[in-house]
């Protein structure tokens, strides 16, 4: 176990450019920060989230929200596929229940998925699939909203989870999408 302060992480401060593995590149604008894989895993632990050790973190400097990027090499995904929203929600609930087992082992609070904040929809302008899940922190009953995005690429999808205060969700999504203009798959993944 390690004890690390969030300020001790190796933050990359904008304006700069960075990579998300070998699949994508991102421009970090002024006022934003980025963490590579090693420090992103530490950040996830500090935020009491289970790290995959494949994620990257992008956020405004004040950390009023943060986005977790992780590539999933599922192959090409059609943007016109019919979505079974009930099946997606059940899969998310099962994943949360499995995650709660690990959270309990670590002495962290658990969470429960309440339902959709909004159902999956395709954003043609930004070539991404998006939805938002409303969850409850089981310890203090506070609401949590995870805005999830799938940016479609040639050999898979970039999974992005935006973690934000429910009261700030709309402004956080707008800020995130505005900053996302600096994201692009590398050649061969577009």
Task: Show where each model-derived region lies.
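Conserved polar/disulfide-associated segments of primarily extracytoplasmic proteins
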Residues: 4-17, 21, 25, 39-146, ...
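Short aromatic-glycine motifs in intrinsically disordered, low-complexity regions
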Residues: 14-27, 167-178
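Non-catalytic surface loops within mature trypsin-like serine protease
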Residues: 22, 30, 73, 164-166, ...
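Short conserved aromatic/hydrophobic patches within beta-strands of well-structured domains
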Residues: 30-36, 182-183
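Soluble periplasmic/extracytoplasmic beta-strand elements of cell-envelope proteins
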Residues: 33-35, 68, 159-161
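Short, surface-exposed beta-strand-loop junctions and turns on beta-sheet-rich folds
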Residues: 34, 41-42, 166
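Extracytoplasmic/lumenal ectodomains and periplasmic regions of secretory and membrane proteins
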Residues: 135-190
């Amino acid at each position: 176990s390690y004890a690390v302060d969030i300020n001790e992480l190796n933050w990359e401060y904008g304006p700069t450019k960075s990579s998300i593995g070998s699949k994508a590149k991102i421009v970090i604008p002024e006022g934003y920060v980025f963490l590579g894989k090693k420090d992103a895993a530490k950040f996830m632990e500090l935020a009491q989230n289970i790290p995959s050790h494949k994620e990257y973190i992008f956020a405004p400097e004040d950390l009023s929200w943060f986005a977790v990027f992780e590539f999933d090499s599922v192959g090409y995904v059609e943007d016109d596929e019919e979505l079974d929203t009930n099946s997606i929600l059940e899969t998310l609930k099962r994943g949360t229940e499995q995650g709660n087992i690990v959270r309990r082992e670590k002495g962290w609070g658990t969470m429960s998925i309440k339902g959709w904040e909004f159902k999956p929809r395709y954003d043609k302008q930004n070539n991404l699939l998006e939805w938002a899940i409303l969850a409850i922190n089981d310890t203090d009953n506070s609401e949590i909203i995870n805005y999830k995005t799938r940016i479609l690429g040639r050999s898979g999808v970039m999974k992005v989870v935006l973690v934000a205060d429910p009261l700030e969700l709309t402004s956080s999504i707008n800020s995130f999408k505005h900053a996302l203009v600096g994201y692009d798959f590398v050649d061969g993944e577009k």
